[in-house]
């Protein structure tokens, strides 16, 4: 081969090499782009899952466990003392919410934003449409000291019930389980 032919051949190979290198660089860039998209999709998926979990927690559709208190209320057997009413339970729930309770249940009926607590008669109270009987066991997850203080302070709901003659016990715990709401959540007035 002559020198001119060698130079031409070398130039052809150099051109082919540069073209192959260019394609390689483009493919590397695409691979990197796909990796970033995959990571972004994973991050998006994780974010969506976290939001779904938080929404389910707020809707009461998941069990919640953490520090908190368990209150047991046994009504007095004396006929001279007024029975425990739905209003008493509502006052306890409201006091717990004000003290920062993150989840509350009464006799394992999860308290939601649309929970109804109503008197049926002197023996029965309905929570979420379910009839509950005494003793009433109220569980609340949150700062256990704050929750207890909200109930036992002077003029607190538990303090008032004790003064009336009802038996009220409050136990602080590092492990309180508030079970999920098993019913269907339906809205009457919200449009889809």
Task: Give names to the regions the model predicted.
Residues 1-192:
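Core subunits and conserved enzymes of cellular information-processing
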